[in-house]
Each structure stands twice: as structure tokens, then as C-alpha cells.
């Protein structure tokens, strides 16, 4: 079992398999060239697999595959299948912008993927183009429908931004509710890579907009996880991830492995442990030692609301959010 210095059990790893992305979202990497990253720097997936086997043996129960855009990584379905074969009890989930999902959903399901989280920031083509710099809405919606068709579990993630998509909160809720998919609204998280004009809506503002149409019956905060779950009177549940008002550090159960082999104990701390050499060499003892050290290095809090702290400079496309 992996336990940090504050007695939190760490049983969840987010694994970035690439920094590459086919979107250039305003809140993530808007000014980054499309060919900014040399693929040769990527860790071989078979080596990452060996690291994750160690993590599973140490008690990890959930692995999320992220990017960048993870569906750009060749051989991903085979990688997932090998992970699933190693331990079928481990939940394997994937975060994606959905652009390539339609053609890959069936293979991902067959490989053993438990769930896919799809980013959907608007239901309007022109807005999706403005937000992501990609004419992507049709592909993303088709990817969602195909995932449902093949039996993949789904969640939707929406970053809510003032004067951009805040007026679509109810429309997106209806879209998700009609398909029996949970949607999670995410407060914009400031970072030095985002466009300066991007401003987010806070949790209470999101709730006020939903309350104009629906009565919100109850609130549930899972013991682990970043989102608060709200239930409408018709039984539908949606989530809000609100790092500004609820840092969820007390129940944090995760670490992150970046695509270059660095283990990040916390999304908002620059400190990381470089495990690249150990992973490349498949050095079992060293990988285990560095994994345990990264857990010990987890800070108590992320300092998000500390007035003296600086805006995070580590890119979300590097750690996968």
C-alpha cells in the first residue's frame, strides 16, 4: 500500500502518454506549435507498462490515461489490453477531446477500458473552433455516440468560461441528461500557458444558472475524487470541480506520471521525481523506490489559494490535468 506523509492512501495514477495534442485550447496550450514535441522523447509504452505493474502491485486501483491527447499515441489499445490482462480489477479510464474517438471506441472497449471522459466545452461549432482552434464538434459528438453504442461508460468535462460558453451550461446539461451521461463543470484553473483573457465562472455561479430551471436536491462529496456531485429532483446527477472554493487536498489519492518519465506528486507543485532512466532500463528496484519517494513527497495542500503563491507554470498538457 502507498501511503503519504499525511496518512492519505495513494491508489490512483494519472499517466500522460504524450504531450502532443491536435487541439490548441485557449485555456491550455493556445500558442503552441503543432509540431512542438519530438516523439522520440516518449517513453516506450512497454516500459511504462512495467512501471504501472509495480504501482498495481503496491496497491494502485485506478489508472487514468491522459495527454496531451492520448488517442494520438500509436499502440494505445494494445497497451490498455496488456494493463487489463495484468489485473482486471484495476479501473482503466481515459481522458480525451473525442476527435479520434469514433474510430477507436470499439477497440478501446475490447481492450478493457472501463470509461472515457470526453471534453465538451460547447455544442456550437463556431465556439468549439474558437476555443480549440479546431473544427471539431462533429467528430467529438460522433465519438460520444459511438462510445455509447459500443458500451463504453462515459463522462463529459466542460471548462466553464465567462463570455465564452457560460450561457451553454443548461444546454450542455440537457445534452448529457438526455444520454444518461454525467457532466462535470470545471472551474477554469489559471496557468501561464492560457490566454490572458480567459476567465472562469465559479461554482456558485454555475449552480445559480442551473437553479433557474431545476431544483437542486442534494450535494454529495465523494470520500475520494475532485468533484462535488449534485442531484436534481428528477434524479439526474452532475458534478462540479471547484479548485477555487474546494481544493480537495485532504482526500487526494493520486500522483501523475508525465510522458517524459517524471513523477509529479501534485498538479500545482513544480517539484517532480525523474524516473525516466529507471523506466527505460526497467530497473524494478529503482522504479519501486522512486514511486514510493514520490508518494512521500506529496505536499499537504496545493497552495492554490495562497496569495503569495505564483500562477502554476507547469503545463496541463504535460501532466494531463
UniProtKB/Swiss-Prot annotation:
Signal sequence region: none
EC number: 4.1.99.22
Gene name tied to this protein: moaA
Subunit structure: Monomer and homodimer.
Obligatory cofactor(s): [4Fe-4S] cluster
Note on how the cofactor is bound: Binds 2 [4Fe-4S] clusters. Binds 1 [4Fe-4S] cluster coordinated with 3 cysteines and an exchangeable S-adenosyl-L-methionine and 1 [4Fe-4S] cluster coordinated with 3 cysteines and the GTP-derived substrate.
EC supergroup of this enzyme: lyase
Entry binding sites for [4Fe-4S] cluster 2: 249, 252, 266
Organism: Helicobacter pylori (strain HPAG1)
Full protein name: GTP 3',8-cyclase
NCBIfam families: moaA (TIGR02666)
